[in-house]
Amino acid sequence: MSKRKLNVALIGYQFMGKAHSNAYRQVARFFDDLEVEPVLKVICGRNEENVRKAAQKYGWEEYDTSWERVVERKDIDLVDVSVPGNMHAPIAIAAANAGKMVLCEKPLANTLAEARQMYEAVQKNKVPNALCHNYRFAPAVQLAKQLIDEGRIGKIYHFRG
């Protein structure tokens, strides 16, 4: 059975961009019954030399340095927002207003007001949207939570996640 192609634009190429690139390439190995096949269309970042290298290294067809240009592309179905949190709202809102599906890395927004604007944009435009919490259900994270809840590692004074 032929799978529907899902043309992906990834905004951000550094740590989370690398993780998301890998996930798109590996998803079919983990889920046999996917109805769609992600197509790595374009990766976007501010530094042209670095984003060009990322496109080659991670298997993207193209690269761009303007997220504004990318979200307006007619051939893009999904915009994956994997940049620092201060840029999530403007990119996600523009993508929703352009009729694109929106996948946003955590944190959703820097403020409640930004989060509400993002919510309103995806609702108004009736676009599918999701927030990534990649490691919430990872076995190591679940075990750490269990050990903390059971008090088995003592009092927590500092946590970085």
What are these regions (language model features)?
Residues 23, 27-30, 57, 93-94, ...:
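Alpha-helical structural signal in soluble globular domains
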